[in-house]
């Protein structure tokens, strides 16, 4: 019975993994990076995300066009833009637990184009951030941050 359940679970996992490249579902990797495929162009993805951040009352700190920075430095890269935002009353709770967690706050969401022209979003998983910094007493806050980033990235997942 246990073996059958294990095989069933593994088959389900394999199906999810195989379907993932064509799905807008967020993909978390062991390095803590969560990637989500966007259904929109680069510019529209950035526009939708920044508007959603502001509509949620979250502070938009900066939008950094990394491809422009690279071009200005004489380097050619695919489109890549870093969006920096956060909610200081929430984010500073992580810093109060571990000051070095400031390396991961405010939130940074990368919008980039891959070699096939597909637009993606990427951010650091909040559970991974908690583990990285050894923060064990901010579970509800990490849960809230995870819910917010999932909501923001969902704004670019469907047409």
What are these regions (language model features)?
Residues 16-25:
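C-terminal segment of classical bacterial N-terminal signal peptides
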Residues 31-37, 76, 99, 116:
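Mature soluble domains of exported/periplasmic/lumenal proteins and thiol-rich metal-chelating peptides
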Residues 50, 54-58, 62-107, 111:
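Compact, glycine-rich, soluble single-domain proteins
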Residues 126-159:
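C-terminal partner/receptor-binding element of secreted or periplasmic proteins
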């Amino acid at each position: 019975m246990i073996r059958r359940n294990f095989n069933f679970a593994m088959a389900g996992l394999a199906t999810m993994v195989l379907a993932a490249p064509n799905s807008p579902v967020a993909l978390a990797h062991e390095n803590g990076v969560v990637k989500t495929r966007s259904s929109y162009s680069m510019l529209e993805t950035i526009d939708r995300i920044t508007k959603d951040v502001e509509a949620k009352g979250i502070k938009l700190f900066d939008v950094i066009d990394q491809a422009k920075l690279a071009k200005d430095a004489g380097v050619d890269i695919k489109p890549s833009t870093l969006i920096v935002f956060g909610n200081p009353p929430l984010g500073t709770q992580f810093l109060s637990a571990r000051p070095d967690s400031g390396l991961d706050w405010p939130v940074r969401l990368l919008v980039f184009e891959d070699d096939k022209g597909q637009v993606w979003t990427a951010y650091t998983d909040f559970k991974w951030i908690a583990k990285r910094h050894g923060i064990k007493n901010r579970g509800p806050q990490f849960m809230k941050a995870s819910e917010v980033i999932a909501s923001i990235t969902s704004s670019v997942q469907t047409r």
